[in-house]
Amino acid sequence: MSEEQGAATDGVILDYDVRKVMAALPHRYPLLLVDRVASLTLNERIHAVKAVSMNEQFFQGHFPGRPIMPGVLQIEALAQAAGVLAVESLGLAGSGKLVYFMAIEDAKFRNPVEPGVLLDLHVEFTQKRSRVCKFSGKAMIGDKVTCEVNFTAMIADS
């Protein structure tokens, strides 16, 4: 693991800031929804964080007077965290490969996400087969689950 990838100990990567997230993902503002990685265990799990600010563009219309982060964007944030997990675990950084999501299953929205919170993004690999990976994700604010989802992704050329 290089210094640029963050501090690594026994397959755990720490100190992974937004610059490193941007090196792993093709997403950019306003659709980059992972601000940092708190921890990543190669081939297992990731805990990423999204700081939800009132300045997010989606709050202008969802909903005026009662801003709530759209559920599909919570799923997208989890998918991006899974993308970072896959890129790091499978050694895809700089390879020209992208993580494309193919299926979303069992999505459940439990609690609203309002401005001013840190949204914790917890994603685990549930299955890996050559170019297809399955994940289970949970978004949380503190100990409250806001969203749960299972999804499938494919590794493909960009």
Curated annotation (Swiss-Prot):
Active site: H62
Keywords: Cytoplasm, Lipid A biosynthesis, Lipid biosynthesis, Lipid metabolism, Lyase
GO molecular-function term, one example from the UniProt record: (3R)-hydroxyacyl-[acyl-carrier-protein] dehydratase activity
Subcellular location: Cytoplasm
InterPro entries: FabA_FabZ, FabZ, HotDog_dom_sf
Keyword Phosphoprotein among record annotations: no
Enzyme class name: lyase
Domain of life: Bacteria
Reaction equation(s) it catalyzes: a (3R)-hydroxyacyl-[ACP] = a (2E)-enoyl-[ACP] + H2O
Enzyme Commission number(s) of this protein: 4.2.1.59
GO cellular component, one term: cytoplasm
GO BP of this protein: fatty acid biosynthetic process; lipid A biosynthetic process
Function (record text): Involved in unsaturated fatty acids biosynthesis. Catalyzes the dehydration of short chain beta-hydroxyacyl-ACPs and long chain saturated and unsaturated beta-hydroxyacyl-ACPs.
Protein name: 3-hydroxyacyl-[acyl-carrier-protein] dehydratase FabZ
The encoding gene: fabZ
